[in-house]
Amino acid sequence: MLQADFVRAFVNKCAQFGLSVGLETCGNFKWEHVHDFISDFDFIYFDIKCLDEELSTKYTGQSNRTILRNLEKLAATAGTSKLIISIALIPGITATEENISSLIELCKKLGITSVRLLPYHTLGKGKYVELGRKYLMDDGLKITDEEVREIQKRLESNSIHCIIEGF
């Protein structure tokens, strides 16, 4: 969280007016910058990609150690009722047997009971073209409704509530 001082002031001001405030984060922040106000959010969407450190480094360019450590601290500090894991379901990358099993294990370990499933799509591809950047994802990547529902069933059979968005 690069603008922690602003976010802290904003959350406090919103609370004065009785406004609900949510946070969406990839979790790659310094805990000492947010520990004193992270519990003030009404809900937190926490993005998780690959739970395997080697795959995380391969696909995101960095280790997921800080992210997972912050998730553990967040679950302990803010409480798991506010916490919703978000995961983009990318075939062969995040929508794998191993990654979903690791996600279930992580949720059970931390007591997290809600997950947002975000099926992969190519809607952002045009932005890359407009910016003159190469789109690195394979055009053939597709996740079917059936595959998404199967992942949803696996999570829900482990007492993890699922929200499917962009489906």
Q: Which residues does each PLM region occupy?
A:
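Conserved AdoMet/S-adenosylmethionine-binding subsite of the radical SAM
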Residues: 1-123
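Auxiliary Fe-S-binding modules of radical SAM enzymes
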Residues: 89-167
